[in-house]
């Protein structure tokens, strides 16, 4: 009936990716740093099986790129690129950098096989020269690539290898980069129905960030910038959103509602009510209320989300409108629901979103069945 929208946090954390709620069986979550030692044997790639459940891969694709690679955070903090350039990096390091740039370009061009081959070359050269930063960064890129391709077992091993290197290099377990990897691992475990690990992963991410935020809230700006604090809050919002998604698909809408409420509050405070991802969270919160039969409350949030989506010409406007129509249908406002579905269909066609077009047409057919008996009874 509904399509959930994923949100992108500040600094491009997460690309929007809609997924359909009805019939989804995905369970979403991280083992912590343990796992493969540094010199991991990278498994051969395997194409993801088609039967993992509707809507799973769009979610994985969204999560996989919700931030820059975690290793990039470490690299940026220590000024690795700048230092290497100033010191006159040797030929091997320069070659690794070029390989990584080529790999990222291939990923952007949707050429995953080519990217994988290039990354293997970069990793081999990084090991030959014992360049630990390059090894870590390459593992992280390989993990993200495997993740978006649905190669969950490969991605798990590679994310753990990345985490092992980061922790071995002195990064703390509460660092945002570690939390980001943990969240990705969590989604892998959830998709594999490894529920104990999944739940533990979400709890680790959320509790660690909440404790971190509490400790850092009084720090002066010269010690920790406003932007750094905001990024940690936004990452918490991401974790709450992912956990809420897991709870909703696990048939726990009331618990999901509480998570979405917290995530929405964070997004409103930091990004504002008109931010595209704040609107996404309003829509998803409405979905959890609707799932509990609280149709009037759901309508309030969904109506507000759709109004804002129209004002800013939201890229997922057609999906928000489709969700609004679904709430109206549950409230037995069939005429209004039909009008909104038709508007959503028009927007979906303009976006050339064939999946949404098909979904909306199915909903219109279902609406027609529901409203026909009412029309007939009126005639009688």
From Swiss-Prot:
UniProt gene name: TTC19
PTM info: Proteolytically cleaved by PARL.
Protein name, per record: Tetratricopeptide repeat protein 19, mitochondrial
Annotated PROSITE patterns: TPR_REGION
Pfam families xrefs: TPR_10, TPR_12
GO BP terms, alphabetized: mitochondrial respiratory chain complex III assembly; mitotic cytokinesis
TPR repeat ranges, renumbered to this chain: 136-169, 179-212, 237-270, 279-312, 318-351
Subunit structure: Binds to the mature mitochondrial complex III dimer, after the incorporation of the Rieske protein UQCRFS1. Interacts with UQCRC1 and UQCRFS1. Interacts with ZFYVE26 and CHMP4B.
SUPFAM superfamilies reported for this sequence: TPR-like
Keywords: Cell cycle, Cell division, Electron transport, Membrane, Mitochondrion, Mitochondrion inner membrane, Primary mitochondrial disease, Repeat, Respiratory chain, TPR repeat, Transit peptide, Transport
Subcellular location: Mitochondrion inner membrane
Function: Required for the preservation of the structural and functional integrity of mitochondrial respiratory complex III by allowing the physiological turnover of the Rieske protein UQCRFS1. Involved in the clearance of UQCRFS1 N-terminal fragments, which are produced upon incorporation of UQCRFS1 into the complex III and whose presence is detrimental for its catalytic activity.
Domain of life, source organism: Eukaryota
